[in-house]
């Protein structure tokens, strides 16, 4: 397994004073995450993608996660954190033992707290080395990127692709500019967006919001042909580059 035990994937061009911490999707630190880091280097930025599943890679494989997510796909975010509802959903789908173990871990509150702790630690490590730091995340990682902005006031900015917004009561602690990108066919995540946007605007926060029509959750990931949208992904990356130049600068 390529990422078994690896702490992170990093690209640090010589002379870079700005770095983007990249948080992976629910699939783990896979080739697509590494490709995002390579794209960032072409824009002139250093990058570091922590392996947030370190120590759990044998269970949290993309295959196991795919089967696990299929078992709970019809549940809301809140229902997925209800152990009884998750168990009932997996029973209906006759999920495998590995899928059950994977979903049990992914929605375990202590494990999720550990993901945030790992994300924050990764940001701290990078901030000790680089003058300017931005977070960028996709899916699960997008939510972590936004949560980091509520916890670390030294961030230059934070970027989320279809991530779950943080609780509205945490918005007051955000000081960094936010770029929030969504797919319009993403009902579960999008239910939380209006209250999040309202809280950001009411708080006078720096928010750039973009929702792409006729796209699904994960549209930026070109390794997932069932959801990838080339046009939206290309434009979203152009906006990401513009936002990084505005908030982190070219280094």
Segments (PLM) and residue ranges:
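N-terminal cap/leader regions of alpha/beta-hydrolase-fold enzymes
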Residues: 1-251
């Amino acid at each position: 397994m390529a990422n078994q035990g690896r702490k992170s994937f990093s690209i640090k061009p010589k002379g870079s004073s700005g770095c983007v911490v990249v948080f992976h999707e629910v699939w783990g630190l896979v080739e697509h995450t590494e490709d995002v880091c390579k794209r960032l280097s072409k824009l002139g930025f250093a990058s570091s993608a922590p392996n947030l599943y370190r120590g759990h890679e044998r269970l949290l494989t993309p295959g196991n996660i795919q089967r696990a997510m299929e078992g709970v796909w019809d549940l809301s975010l809140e229902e997925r954190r209800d152990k009884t509802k998750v168990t009932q959903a997996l029973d209906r789908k006759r999920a495998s033992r590995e899928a059950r173990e994977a979903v049990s871990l992914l929605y375990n509150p202590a494990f999720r707290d550990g993901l945030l702790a790992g994300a924050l630690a990764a940001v701290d490590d990078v901030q000790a080395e680089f003058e300017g730091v931005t977070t960028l995340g996709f899916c699960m990682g997008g939510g972590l990127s936004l949560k980091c902005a509520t916890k670390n006031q030294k961030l230059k900015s934070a970027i989320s692709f279809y991530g779950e917004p943080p609780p509205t009561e945490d918005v007051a602690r955000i000081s960094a500019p936010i770029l929030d990108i969504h797919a319009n066919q993403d009902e579960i995540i999008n239910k939380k967006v209006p209250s999040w946007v309202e809280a950001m605007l009411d708080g006078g926060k720096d928010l750039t919001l973009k929702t792409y029509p006729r796209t699904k959750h994960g549209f930026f990931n070109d390794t997932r042909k069932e959801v990838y949208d080339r046009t939206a992904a290309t434009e979203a990356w152009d906006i990401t580059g513009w936002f990084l130049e505005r908030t982190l600068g070219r280094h």
